[in-house]
């Protein structure tokens, strides 16, 4: 099913050597990506979904073009920018809530299942990862694939930072598969 393919794509990302770099870059649209050797937390999700044929760059840009006012205004922009919008955690949080499912934020590990998307605040910085079907060493929770600066990695870090968002997104026309 979808979740199995998405989490396999996320786990596959951990085999890539990626230098953490969120610098603005001009990229093609649609289907654009920064060079494969660089990336940030959002690129783990963008590349995982793209492996399933879902272009978050296009999906986010089209939604922002249609509903720009519902997206955060943190960057002083007056219109969507397809080079960077899909690489910003706050934009993805809005997109996933609008086109997927926003789930309750809890401190119960049983509420976070493979395929779920989780956002945290790491100090003042937003962060995003994907829950995968690999249990923590104590079996208490699923682990997360994310990139917090060391490249894409599998880590038992679900509750290491304050959880601020919890989502599911199964692609365009998400039918809560």
Regions found by a protein language model. Name each.
Residues 38, 120, 148-150:
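Acidic helix/loop microenvironments that form the catalytic cleft of cell-wall polysaccharide enzymes
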């Amino acid at each position: 099913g979808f979740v199995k393919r998405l989490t396999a794509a996320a786990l596959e990302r951990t085999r890539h050597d990626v230098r953490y770099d969120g610098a603005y870059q001009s990229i093609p649209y649609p289907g654009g990506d920064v060079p494969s050797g660089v990336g940030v937390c959002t690129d783990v999700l963008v590349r995982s979904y793209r492996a399933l044929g879902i272009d978050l760059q296009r999906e986010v840009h089209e939604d922002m073009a249609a509903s720009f006012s519902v997206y955060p205004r943190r960057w002083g922009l007056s219109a969507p920018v397809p080079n960077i919008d899909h690489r910003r955690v706050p934009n993805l949080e809005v997109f996933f809530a609008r086109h997927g499912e926003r789930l309750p934020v809890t401190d119960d590990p049983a509420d976070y299942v493979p395929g779920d998307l989780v956002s945290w605040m790491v100090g003042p910085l937003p962060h995003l990862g994907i829950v995968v079907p690999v249990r923590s060493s104590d079996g208490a929770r699923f682990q997360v694939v994310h990139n917090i600066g060391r490249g894409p990695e599998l880590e038992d870090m679900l509750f290491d930072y304050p959880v601020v968002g919890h989502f599911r997104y199964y692609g365009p026309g998400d039918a809560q598969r």
